[in-house]
Amino acid sequence: MRCPFCGNENTRVIDTRAAEDGFAIKRRRECENCSKRFTTYERLDDRPLIVVKKDGSKQLFDKHKIYTGLLKACEKRPIAESKLLEIAEEIERELKNRLEQEVTSLEIGEMVMSRLKKLDEVAYVRFASVYRQFKDVNSFLEELKKLLNGGENS
């Protein structure tokens, strides 16, 4: 494995662990030239998951988009980034375990919202405000009322 810092091809593995619930192997490596450490992941090369957007366009699934959306929703909230990565990986795993190769962005958004609702109500409302694209304050207040009343349709 080539060192990302100095380009040297001589690196050694100093730690190996299962990652992503056993679907990947995480390796810590150290460059024998510059002594810097870096992490690599080994994963199965599986069929791609396609996301069908609201406008009908399609793109490859990207777990990182879920993670960055979670980060934005949870900004300045007492939630560990590792928990957000865990949620993104859980959603990815759930989607890949389905037999369908395509998933709608709507389904992904609902999966994120259901997990955020359990994790942190403020983060849930933040995410919902962007995801549901509230047209005005009243529609936003309706979502808050559902949350406060324990409504199932939120």
From Swiss-Prot:
GO terms for molecular function: ATP binding; DNA binding; zinc ion binding. Residues 49-139 form the ATP-cone domain. Its cofactor is Zn(2+). A zinc finger (unnamed) spans 3-34. The keyword Transcription applies. InterPro entries: ATP-cone_dom, NrdR-like_N, RNR_NrdR-like. Coiled coil: none annotated. It comes from the Bacteria. Disulfide bonds: none annotated. Binds 1 zinc ion. It holds the Pfam family Zn_ribbon_NrdR. Keywords: ATP-binding, DNA-binding, Metal-binding, Nucleotide-binding, Repressor, Transcription, Transcription regulation, Zinc, Zinc-finger. One of its GO terms (biological process) is negative regulation of DNA-templated transcription. The keyword Nucleotide-binding applies. Negatively regulates transcription of bacterial ribonucleotide reductase nrd genes and operons by binding to NrdR-boxes. PANTHER family: TRANSCRIPTIONAL REPRESSOR NRDR (PTHR30455:SF2). NCBIfam families: transcriptional regulator NrdR (TIGR00244). Belongs to the NrdR family. This is Transcriptional repressor NrdR. It comes from Carboxydothermus hydrogenoformans (strain ATCC BAA-161 / DSM 6008 / Z-2901).
